[in-house]
């Protein structure tokens, strides 16, 4: 592609489902004139209970789809995908920069007063080498106690649009109360789906506990890399186009992809 075409090529994002839309919102807020292409692999969600080999294969297929549609940068908008597959992707696809997502345990740990933080994430994220390396450093060097909790079942309910269901509330109570009892003062949402549960989570924990995720940091890093590679579209008059693609439930993705400012943005939701 020519330089002008590269500038308007889309930022590619993929996730195991709709969770990565939380990352898309941060990227769009920071860079509203960038085209985007979001792939929701709903058919294979959740990734958190799959083997590392399965996750790598799915992330590889997602990457190929985005590259076939001329993505200029790829955001792995999935914690499980990042912690298990991003090293493989960067090694295989050296022609394109990748942005990954890790649970924000480092900033949480460094800001914690009680030196106790909670992490709610998928099983595969919590057992990954990347998470183990970061958490071990915090434990050894900063003397931070990390209380880990697998959010089993949460992604399935979010994908089904049941964020406010009684079943969701029961699961959140089950997962959050032990961490609260341990005296955490930070709760890290270690899955891009989980920010959609923020209202429910805040109702179930003391107001003194701060809840953080990686969304804004990922958007900022994406912008930094686009600048570094001279790929940032700085034309403030450019009207961006956003395309959303799923291999699963079209109606669910439409709910999460909804954007209010239709005059400035064109959103296309397709089923592949």
Predicted regions and their residues:
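Non-catalytic structural scaffold of enzyme domains
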Residues: 1-272
């Amino acid at each position: 592609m020519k330089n002008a075409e590269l500038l308007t090529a889309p930022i590619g994002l993929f996730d195991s489902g709709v969770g990565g839309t939380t990352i898309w919102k941060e990227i769009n807020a920071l860079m509203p004139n960038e085209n985007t292409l979001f792939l929701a692999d709903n058919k294979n969600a959740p990734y958190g209970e799959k083997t590392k080999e399965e996750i790598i294969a799915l992330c590889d297929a997602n990457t190929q789809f985005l590259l076939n549609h001329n993505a200029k940068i790829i955001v792995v908008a999935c914690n499980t995908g990042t912690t298990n597959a991003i090293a493989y992707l960067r090694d295989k696809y050296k022609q394109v920069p990748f942005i990954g997502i890790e649970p924000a345990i480092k900033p949480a740990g460094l800001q914690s007063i009680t030196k106790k933080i909670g992490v709610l994430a998928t099983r595969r994220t919590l057992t990954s080498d990347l998470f183990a390396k970061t958490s071990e450093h915090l434990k050894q060097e900063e003397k931070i106690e990390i209380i880990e909790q697998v959010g089993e079942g949460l992604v399935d309910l979010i994908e089904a649009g049941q964020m406010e269901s009684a079943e969701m509330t029961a699961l959140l109570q089950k997962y959050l109360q032990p961490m609260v009892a341990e005296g955490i003062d930070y709760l890290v949402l270690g899955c891009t789906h989980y920010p959609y549960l923020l209202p429910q989570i805040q109702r179930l924990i003391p107001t003194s506990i701060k809840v953080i995720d990686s969304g804004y940091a990922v958007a900022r890093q994406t912008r930094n890399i686009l600048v570094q590679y001279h790929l940032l579209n700085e034309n403030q008059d450019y009207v961006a186009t956003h395309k959303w693609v799923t291999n699963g439930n079209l109606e669910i993705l439409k709910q999460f992809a909804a954007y209010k400012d239709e005059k400035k943005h064109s959103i296309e939701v397709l089923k592949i």
